[in-house]
Amino acid sequence: MKFSPLVDELIQALKGLPGVGPKSAQRMAFNLLERDRKVGLKLAESLKNAMTDVGHCQSCRTFTEQSLCPICASHKRGASGVICVVETPADVLAIEAGGHFNGRYFVLLGHLSPLDGVGPEELGLSLLEQHLQTLDVTELILATNPTVEGDATAHFIADMARRHKVIISRIAHGVPVGGELEYVDSTTLALSFNGRIAL
């Protein structure tokens, strides 16, 4: 059974979100229309504002409404001399939530994937290299995902960064805190053994 074209359009738009299938999209649309019209209107306004006003930081490429994000605008963060390279703005939030990093970021907005047409230019690596030349960078921390593409991207960036005489490090990978060994896959266990530290 078809509903009004506007309801169908709303369901189709919600289906475009990651992880939202047809049934979930229908439930969300009906909930907004049946019970939460104020929430729906607020969602529409927030979505419109974000799509119109949120862009990318000119320095690190994360999301911001300004030309520079608050982290890049902070002299204290820049003075650390450390840049952490991540794949997505969500990675910045995850690291910031930990509260253990006080440097700046560089967001790739993806990873190298020649089959998908994603090369160094699409990742903004010329801007990263410009930072290595002009900013007082002492260390580059590569925090790309532990995937084949993430590892290839990290190696490519490390090769590029070696020309600039900075310390290059890669975040550790292995058994999560609170994880039980019997549930950890063999690749993660191998990484954990290879990356072990002395006590």
Curated annotation (Swiss-Prot):
Q: What does the entry give for GO biological process?
A: DNA recombination; DNA repair
Which pairs of Cys residues are joined through disulfide bonds in the record?
none
Q: Which SMART domains match?
A: TOPRIM
Enumerate the spans annotated as Toprim domain. 81-176
ZnF regions (C4-type) run across 57-72
The UniProt entry, under CDD domains, shows: TOPRIM_recR
Identify the keywords attached in UniProt to this record, alphabetized. DNA damage, DNA recombination, DNA repair, Metal-binding, Zinc, Zinc-finger
What PROSITE patterns does UniProt report for this protein, alphabetically?
TOPRIM
Q: GO terms for molecular function, please?
A: DNA binding; zinc ion binding
Q: Which InterPro entries match?
A: DNA_Rcmb_RecR, Rcmb_RecR, Rcmb_RecR_Znf, TOPRIM_dom, TOPRIM_RecR
- The yes or no answer to whether the keyword Phosphoprotein is present is no
* TM ranges: none
Instruction: Name the Pfam families for this protein.
Output: RecR_C (PF21175), RecR_HhH (PF21176), RecR_ZnF (PF02132), Toprim_4 (PF13662)
Gene3D superfamilies in alphabetical order = 3.40.1360.10, 6.10.250.240, RecR Domain 1
Family stated for the protein in its record: Belongs to the RecR family.
Q: Which PANTHER family match?
A: RECOMBINATION PROTEIN RECR
| Record function comment | May play a role in DNA repair. It seems to be involved in an RecBC-independent recombinational process of DNA repair. It may act with RecF and RecO.
Q: What's this protein's name?
A: Recombination protein RecR
What gene is behind this protein?
recR
